[in-house]
């Protein structure tokens, strides 16, 4: 099976469209190796016209590693596989949820820049998202190239240089990030299960060797720093990483499939008229194999 990749951002090795692969069909191991290499180069891969079911999505995803089990917040809608996270504004009766519905509020946290599962002790490697139903406008997924942002960061306005950040540890928490946008929606049981974790502020990709600032909305503070100083640094670095020149915005068409490397990018979902148009996305997540600390 031969395929080509069309760069989606002229002049950058970031975001590419894969042409010539049907992920529901048998794919030999050499093609998976080529896709791994392509993901290392582009960090985001787009596959158009992939009308797949959950079994097919899981089978394709498992070729890249073991899959995470979804959080309970991302179940429902008839999904029976724990490997599938359903991110949707549609309830179990196939009706559009109200804007104030608990799950709608929870999923609005995805509108903040983040790296999937950075709130877990061993964060995710790869995410694969299938657009089962998409709105006619809005609801784009934006991706920021954390590699290029790290390479080009000129240093902080507060006098902090890149070398000063080596070895620093940050606390990541999904409880913290969700409170930023929707308030306290977690039970005491959830808070016990989702305790904060420690992540390196700078991490090196184990396959490509490239470094990134490992941040996003789950990142709460820098260990050992004054809280206000650490929040200012996180805000400054995140603003730099998500400058327009580092960002690819994916406009979804029905049954698009998008794969990205969480070790190389931040991403977020854009809003849409969510009480008018349906948006149903199914995600599989390739588990990480080592902690960052």
Regions found by a protein language model. Name each.
Residues 2-259, 263-293:
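Fe(II)/2-oxoglutarate oxygenase catalytic core
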